[in-house]
Amino acid sequence: MPPEVIPWMSPCLSQSMSFVLAGIGHPMKFRRGDVIYTSPGLFGNLMYVRSGFVVKALLDPVRDEPLLLSMAGPGALCGNYENLYVRDRMPRRHWCLTSTEVLVVNQELLLKIADQNPEWQHELSGYSSVSSICDRMGMFLNYSGTVEERLGALLLLMLHCEEPAAMANLFSKGVEWVELPFYPDKGTIAR
């Protein structure tokens, strides 16, 4: 089954690939605001998000300002995943929007395991493409809506990724508000 394409949100991996990553990764926890990946760098970890949200941004090389591309929620990759198949050498920074738990995974080991199963190999090779589509859809929304529309869309998409069942409450008769399970920092919302 192809991954769900949602603007601003990195695609989630299949359940079978998630089990593989759980078997070969080691857990790490980060606090809100922690920078967990910067490129170019000497070392970069491939990470699988178990809980929380990670902001993924390109850096403007002239001003060192981030351009929000997407967010990785539970079930998505972050960190040095671009080097699995894409080597564009664009400077990037990933930081935690909320308290986050990730699994740090050895890239070479993951690729060797994926070579044993054509479905996993296809999933990993297509991950960068689907991520690019999500990023570009988010950039389109950045330029097509008002600030209020963009913020509302971002919060709804985050709610959809974190708690899909809560989305049903939005369309229930008589419900005037739905509590968000997270609170993005002002800097991320401002971008």
Region roles according to the model:
Residues 154-158:
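Short amphipathic alpha-helical elements of helix-turn-helix/winged-helix folds
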Residues 1-32, 77, 82-85:
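Cyclic nucleotide-binding regulatory module and flanking cytosolic helices
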Residues 76, 148-152, 186:
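Short, leucine-enriched amphipathic alpha-helices that occur as contiguous helical runs
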